Design a protein with these regions (language model features):
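Non-globular, low-confidence helical/coil segments that flank catalytic cores
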Residues: 88, 108-114, 121-138, 151-155, ...
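N-terminal leader/targeting segments
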Residues: 1-79, 284
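Membrane-helix interface and helix-disruption motif detector
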Residues: 19-29, 398, 461-467
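Membrane-interface helix/helix-cap signal primarily in integral membrane proteins
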Residues: 61-234, 554-561, 567, 601-603, ...
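Hydrophobic alpha-helical transmembrane segments in multi-pass membrane proteins
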Residues: 37-38, 54-55, 165, 220-402, ...
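Residue-level signal for inorganic ion chemistry
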Residues: 15, 90, 327, 386, ...
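Hydrophobic alpha-helical segments
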Residues: 1-22, 295, 421-453
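Hydrophobic alpha-helical transmembrane segments of integral membrane proteins
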Residues: 391-437
């Protein structure tokens, strides 16, 4: 069966990708003319064998024309105000988020007859701002450059942000008596988060808020990292799983009444997608589930591939630069893998003798076996296309993901269903929601503790930081592709054993290279900061661990673990500025640090207290450098010099001299 919409959508996506990469409107228009002419020639030939080619060429032509004219149509003359400082009145589209310098607010800016999505940056707290509020201020307008390769610009482009507005302080906020209907989903999301924070314990409220509303602000970086390593971070990124669970609740309520299910389900899905901020993954799932509900009503058979194509085409028509969104790429890659290969993998696993007997037996055992096989099949199939993207963007390949998904996804489904009902109850009667919330918090803790426990296992995840780990990741991806595509599959146990043996060989080679009896001194790329790794034989020291982000400690841990090193003999922090010590606590959390050497410091420091608390928690010995120290080891030494002054944080820092040979 030829899926015309799928071919057209694929061609449109190829055209959008080509335009974004090249960024040449003139070349795009010429190419569109050529492809359009070829499509016309193929149409005149009336050869059925050329039907797919005609549709593909037409998709290329339309896609290139749409991308070439997109900014002119939607931005218009507003672009001429780039760099100007103007008095503006904008409307808040969602709740503000904190930044290191104040707050960022998604807003709508009326300019030159257009209503443009922008981000307003304030150098003050913005907690009182709600969706629908009017904000008046004087702001400098900075147009997001469509040809820029900066990560921040690409993120803005992928989310449809046209301008960044820098307003400083003194913004006047007006609260309307009744926000417009289009702000109801965002207002409801904000109210739901408030009730979740009220009735749930602090350690579970952040997870519930992320699961139900897509707001991950309540999850600390350590929890996010543990969820990522364990392979279940997708549970707190609103996606098809969440929309499917919500639709399942509606279907249970409506039974076999399809019209009622569509009448309730479609508005519910639309409201939920808007409530969670309409990320690409949620929109994709929303479109697919909506088509699933509507197909029987118009006497059509639901075709998942066509639904996936329709979702992609819709998102690219709204904003072709959505292609740059990592969530868009991962969502469609995972969905395509599941649609194409999950059924095949399920049948292959179900043919195994032991599983076949369990599945045929029925009862609770059969149901559990079906859930097990389904979970493993979907997890593996979703990796078919998503694995290289995950490795590229996040530098992580979780090995425990299939097992952790199998152990926790049932709990996540229950948490979502019960959590939504409890949050809705809290809106009506807050006091009655405390008891159920307390009970559900234990299930949330089970998921979080599972993620924490599995993330701390050796080789829970592989980090392609060196040749050996990268080669093994390529081998793993090849095995998944072979298992998914080949009609003749080797025994699963043989494949797993071969991959395990290859991983052991890669780890041994990496460990041997890192621990050869010579001196290595590595400066890690941690942004605006410093993290130095000194290694001689089996003795490892890290000097400073800070950067422009929290990730410095995680980056150092992943670098060391990619070489099979889970131990650090000495962590030396020269002073307590974030660019030198901001990632130290995370490094102590992720590695076995024997000793940490610190300056006394002359000022109270929250960062210092955080490092000391983490060291006490992990059993790391703390040594304050009040006098010069000599750390000797086989083949080298480190001289640690005490501070020469106590005037301020920089002057009271310690110095290190590394020697080898």
């Amino acid at each position: 069966m030829m899926r015309r919409l799928g071919i057209f959508a694929a061609a449109f996506a190829v055209a959008a990708a080509g335009f974004i990469l090249l960024g040449n409107a003139a070349a795009a228009l010429i190419t569109a003319a050529v492809t359009g002419a070829l499509a016309g020639v193929f149409l005149l030939l009336r050869d059925r064998r050329l039907r797919a080619a005609r549709i593909f060429l037409l998709g290329l032509c339309v896609g290139l024309l749409w991308c070439a004219g997109y900014r002119a149509v939607f931005l218009g003359r507003a672009a001429r105000h780039d760099g100007e400082r103007l008095p503006v009145t904008v409307t808040a589209l969602a709740a503000p988020s904190e930044t290191p310098y104040g707050a960022a607010v998604p807003v709508e800016l009326p300019l030159e007859g257009r209503r443009l999505s922008c981000t307003l940056y304030l150098r003050e707290s913005a907690e009182e701002i709600c969706p629908g509020d009017c904000i008046s201020c004087t702001a400098k307008l900075r147009l997001v450059d469509a040809r820029s390769k900066k990560a921040s610009d690409r993120y803005s482009q992928s989310h449809g942000v046209w301008f960044r507005l820098s307003a400083g302080t003194g913004a006047a906020v007006t609260h309307p008596a009744h926000p417009g209907v289009r702000f109801w989903p965002a207002c409801f999301s904000m109210l739901l988060r408030q009730k979740i924070n009220t009735v749930f314990d602090a350690d579970s409220a952040g997870f519930l808020s992320a699961l139900l509303t897509g707001d991950r602000g309540g999850l600390d970086m350590q929890t996010r990292n543990e969820l990522s390593i364990a392979g279940i971070y997708h549970t707190v990124a609103v996606s098809g799983m969440h929309v499917s669970i919500l639709l399942g609740m509606v279907m249970q309520l409506c039974g076999s009444r399809r019209r009622l299910a569509a009448a309730i389900g479609v508005p519910t899905i639309v409201f939920f997608v808007l409530m969670t901020g309409a990320p690409a993954s949620a929109v994709r799932a929303g479109v697919m589930q909506t088509l699933l509900l509507l197909a029987p009503l118009v006497q059509r058979e639901d075709d998942p591939i066509t639904s996936l194509s329709a979702a992609g085409l819709f998102l690219l028509l709204v904003n072709p630069w959505t292609l740059l969104d990592v969530g868009f790429q991962l969502s469609f890659a995972s969905a395509a893998g599941i649609l194409l290969f999950a059924g095949r993998l399920y049948r292959a696993l179900a043919e195994r003798r032991a599983l076949r007997a369990c599945l045929r037996r029925g009862g609770i055992g059969g149901q559990l076996a079906a859930v097990l096989v389904s979970s493993v099949s979907c997890s593996t199939a979703s990796m078919t296309f998503a694995l290289p993207l995950s490795a590229y963007y996040f530098g992580t390949v979780s090995l425990v993901a299939p097992l952790v998904n199998m152990l926790t996804l049932w709990a996540v489904s229950l948490i979502f269903t019960a959590g939504m009902l409890i949050a809705l109850l809290a809106l009506v009667w807050t006091g009655a929601a405390y008891g159920p919330a307390w009970l559900l918090s234990w299930l949330v803790r089970y998921v979080l503790l599972s993620a924490r426990g599995f993330s701390k296992l050796p080789c829970a995840a592989i980090y392609p930081e060196n040749f050996y780990m990268t080669a093994w990741c390529v081998l793993l991806y090849g095995a998944i592709l072979f298992y998914a595509l080949s009609p003749v599959r080797p025994r699963f146990s043989v494949t797993a054993a071969s991959l395990a043996a290859a991983l052991c060989a890669a780890l041994v080679c990496a460990y041997a290279q890192f621990h050869l009896p010579y001196f290595t001194f590595t400066a890690l790329d941690v942004g605006q900061g410093q993290c130095l790794v000194y290694q001689r034989g089996t003795w490892t020291a890290v000097i400073d661990c800070g950067g422009s982000t929290w990730n410095a400690g995680e980056d150092a841990a992943r670098y060391l673990q990619s070489y099979g090193e889970y131990r650090i003999e000495a962590l030396i922090l020269t002073h307590y500025d974030a660019d030198h010590a901001g990632g130290a606590a995370q490094l102590i959390e992720r590695q076995r640090v024997e000793r940490v050497f610190l300056p006394r410091g002359v000022e109270a420091s929250d960062l210092k207290e955080t490092i000391l608390a983490k060291a006490a928690e992990r059993g790391t010995e703390v040594i304050f450098v009040d006098e010069d120290l000599l750390l000797s080891f086989d083949g080298g030494e480190l001289r640690v010099f005490a501070p020469l002054s106590d005037k301020d944080s920089n002057d009271s820092g310690i110095s290190v001299l590394a020697s080898a040979g």
